Amino acid sequence: NLNLLGEREPGQYGQRTLADIMQELGQFAEGCGVSLDDHQTNSEGGMVDLIQQAGTEGVDYIIINPAGYTHTSVAIRDALLAVAVPFVEVHLSAVGAREPFRQISYFSDIAMGVISGFHGESYLLALQAILNRIEP
């Protein structure tokens, strides 16, 4: 449902669209001299395919918002483990302050870190955390 950002529950997820967030993130990445590819899919299989593609293309890091699959997807977890690309789990809402079922993540124990609750800024914070770990 990330394609509905800006329309769907703006109190939880913010008012900016995914395109707006990704444009800002891309500009920040470019200013830091790193390349960034962004993808969005509503399907679990599509997300597995994108993760596997990242692994074969030699991607250095993944920033992933598994959204509703956070609490359900062994397939996405297994794909992340299979490619062994370090990743940051991102959530726009403060999942720890939401319903109990949303507080369960199949990914947080294998992630470099988890950032949640900062709406669209969560992606920027994830990228900054990754850049801080890259040695000059």
Which residue ranges define each predicted feature?
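Glycine-rich phosphate/diphosphate-binding loop of Rossmann-like nucleotide-binding domains
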Residues: 1-31
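Short glycine-rich anion-binding loops that position phosphate/pyrophosphate groups of nucleotides
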Residues: 1-2, 67-70, 93-95
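Glycine/Thr-rich phosphate-binding loops of Rossmann-like dinucleotide-binding domains
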Residues: 4-5, 72-73, 98
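Short, glycine/charged-enriched secondary-structure capping and boundary segments
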Residues: 8-13, 52-54, 76-80, 102-105
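Short helix-capping segments at alpha-helix termini
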Residues: 30-33, 83-85
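Short, glycine-/small-residue-rich phosphate/pyrophosphate-handling segment
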Residues: 37-38, 88, 97-136
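N-terminal small/polar loop signature for handling phosphorylated ligands or for N-terminal nucleophile
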Residues: 41-62, 68-84
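Glycine/small-residue-rich loop that forms an oxyanion/phosphate-binding "nest" at active or ligand-binding sites
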Residues: 77-93, 105-108
